[in-house]
Amino acid sequence: MLVQQMLFMASGDGFAGEQESWTNPSNATNNLFYTWTVPAGVTAISAVVVGGGGGGSPAVSFNDGSDEYQTRPGAGGGGGGLTYNNSITVTPGETLNICVGCGGSRGNSNSSDQKDWANAGYGGHSWIKRGGTNG
């Protein structure tokens, strides 16, 4: 289950606090990036940004040479980084680009080389950018 998330909370003169979140991971392969347009009356936002966690190693079974298969449990992946900013100044009508980082890939259980079992991928970056292009 993916738990990466980005959450905005907006407030400003005459604007009742609202929040919006994005949980589907973005990456260059699926080209799934988000945009958010600052509503009228909003002059500041709070953002909680969580990066994708690292992948874990898989459980593996192997023959240790004694004709008995050994099973080793997998290990959990690393946690994604988190940052929180309570007051980002924005301009009504401004567009923010958003990327929700993907979780890392798991280690390779199909390899006979034990070091590949733990060779899991790192998690993706999550970010917020003003205008410009994604990536």
Predicted regions and their residues:
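Enriched but not universal
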Residues: M1-S46
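Glycine-rich strand-loop-strand elements at beta-sheet edges
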Residues: T23, A28-T35, P39, V49-G132
